[in-house]
Amino acid sequence: MTNFPIPEMAKPYLEYDMIQNHTELPAFPEFRARLLYACLQSSGSGEAPGDEFRLPAVGGVRRGMDELYTLVTSLVQMGLDIHDMVPESSDRKEKRAARSRQLKVLAGDYFSAKFYHLLAQAGQIETIRHLSAAICEANRLKVNLYMLMKQWKLTAEEYVHQTVNIRMQLFLPFRSKMQGVVSGLWPDVLHSFTRCEVLAQEMRRLDSPQSLRGSWAYWHLWQEASKEERKQLAAEEPDPLKIRSLLHKYNAGGHLFHLLEAQVQHVWSCVKQLDSDKLMQEITQLVETFAAPLRKMKVLEER
């Protein structure tokens, strides 16, 4: 796999003692960032910024626009994600909890603002406009999702659909920086890949019934459960043992497995349409992140 310098380049913006000591950061958007970087590199869009602009050096190598676009998009995504980690209620008055909440808000604002600063330095005004519009659209979609949740009108499939659309938004505008077949396939590849990412994350959430609220499994159970079972789901502190029983009863893990398996197959069909062997190899290795665990699970089931 091609060297991926973005996490290292992001460190100067992410590693602040105050943030690290008093709150937690969301995960770096590794998969979507790798996908974007690979497609930009394949399109040959890697012109270098002007002499007046310097990205953080990694291994002494000067970086170009592919790195800049991927870096700023990743920083904005982390800014939006850390804002999502801010608790809805501020009832907890402990000094540590209050400080963590405040720093999440400030860190999110800081990461989100960095894209403007870095792109402006590089003279990328049009990219600022496109990325700003994408941020607005992502926030609009989040509001729609939260409203459906509060009104209890959300289905499990709608939850996945909405979550995927939200996570795609910041990466979609870079289609204009791509060329040829890659440009045409970018929306479908990004959608399929992001859906794999979401479904894989939802499968991992099954291991923590105590934090299942708002997940795919939660809405799946809500659709299938009886009136009495819904009361258990809606409880402020649901019994983990009862939730595990419901997950087993309504085969949440099995449904997610088949959804992810089907989505991985769709990604493979997209990959076969690419006209670059190098890019096909890059994306194949990324898809294997999702495909390999599925194969292992299937082998275990067949024993």
What are these regions (language model features)?
Residues 1-303:
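All-alpha prenyltransferase/terpene-synthase fold signal
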